[in-house]
Amino acid sequence: MAAVRGVRVVGTSPGLLLGRGMRAFLLLLCLAARGGALYFHIGETEKKCFIEEIPDETMVIGNYRTQLYDKQREEYQPATPGLGMFVEVKDPEDKVILARQYGSEGRFTFTSHTPGEHQICLHSNSTKFSLFAGGMLRVHLDIQVGEHANDYAEIAAKDKLSELQLRVRQLVEQVEQIQKEQNYQRWREERFRQTSESTNQRVLWWSILQTLILVAIGVWQMRHLKSFFEAKKLV
C-alpha cells in the first residue's frame, strides 16, 4: 500500500535566502492554504493513507463522508449508517496516536506532539456487510490544520465575543501558528544540516578508506614483484 502524498515544494532553504519579514509573509500564505477538501475512491479491503507535515502541538480536524456506488443507477449514493470507516493516525516516530472506528460520516480530531510527517489512514469495514462487499466507495475528506481547525462562529457564541474581539483572537492564533511553522522549518533545517554533515563525514571516511586500500594494494604488488624478480634472479 503506497501512501498518497500532498503537493510539496522543493527548493533552497528559506532560512538561507529570505529575511524574517519575507519568511513570515510566506508562512502566512502557507497557513492560508493549509487544509482543503478532496475525494478519493476506495475498494472493499483497500486502505488509503495521506502524509501531512504538521508542527508540534497543533490541532488537526478531519471531516469525511462516504458514498456507495449504486450499480443500478450507475452513480454514487449516500452510504447507509451501517457502513463505517476506521481511522488510524501515526506520528513521525510511527506511534499510533489515533485508532478508532467511525460511522459512514464523521469527524476525527487529534493533536500533534512531535513535529514532522504524520500518516493518516482510512479503510472501510465493508467486509462485515455482505450487501456492501465488493462495492466501491467514494470518500470525501476535508483536513484542517492549526487555526483553520477552529470554528470561530462557535467560539464567538460560546465566549460571547464581539466581532472585533473575535478578529483579534483570530489574529493572535494566526501569529501563534506562524511561530509554530517557523519553529518547524528551523527544526527541518537543523535536521537537514545534521544529515548533510553526517553524509559528508561518511564520504570523507570512505575516501580515506579507499585511499588506504589502494596504498595497501600497491605495497603488496611491489613486494610481490620484488619477490618474483628475486626468485627469477633478475635483480
UniProtKB/Swiss-Prot annotation:
> What is the protein name for this chain?
Transmembrane emp24 domain-containing protein 9
Q: Which Pfam families match?
A: EMP24_GP25L
Q: How is it modified after translation?
A: N-linked glycosylated containing high mannose.
Specify where it is mainly localized: endoplasmic reticulum
Q: How does it sit in the membrane?
A: Single-pass type I membrane protein
Its cellular-component GO annotations read: COPII-coated ER to Golgi transport vesicle; endoplasmic reticulum; endoplasmic reticulum membrane; endoplasmic reticulum-Golgi intermediate compartment; endoplasmic reticulum-Golgi intermediate compartment membrane; Golgi apparatus; Golgi membrane; synaptic vesicle
**SMART domains cross-referenced by the UniProt entry:** EMP24_GP25L (SM01190)
UniProt key word Iron? no
User: Residues on the Lumenal side?
Assistant: 38-202
Q: Would you indicate the residue range of the signal peptide?
A: 1-37
Coiled-coil spans are 154-184
This protein's assembly is summarised as:
Monomer and homodimer in endoplasmic reticulum. Predominantly monomeric and to lesser extent homodimeric in endoplasmic reticulum-Golgi intermediate compartment and cis-Golgi network. Probably oligomerizes with other members of the EMP24/GP25L family such as TMED2, TMED7 and TMED10. Interacts with TMED5. Interacts (via C-terminus) with COPG1; the interaction involves dimeric TMED9. Interacts with PTPN2 and SPAST. Interacts with STX17; the interaction is direct.
Q: Which UniProt keywords apply?
A: Acetylation, Coiled coil, Endoplasmic reticulum, Glycoprotein, Golgi apparatus, Membrane, Protein transport, Signal, Transmembrane, Transmembrane helix, Transport
Alphabetized PANTHER family for the sequence:
TRANSMEMBRANE EMP24 DOMAIN-CONTAINING PROTEIN
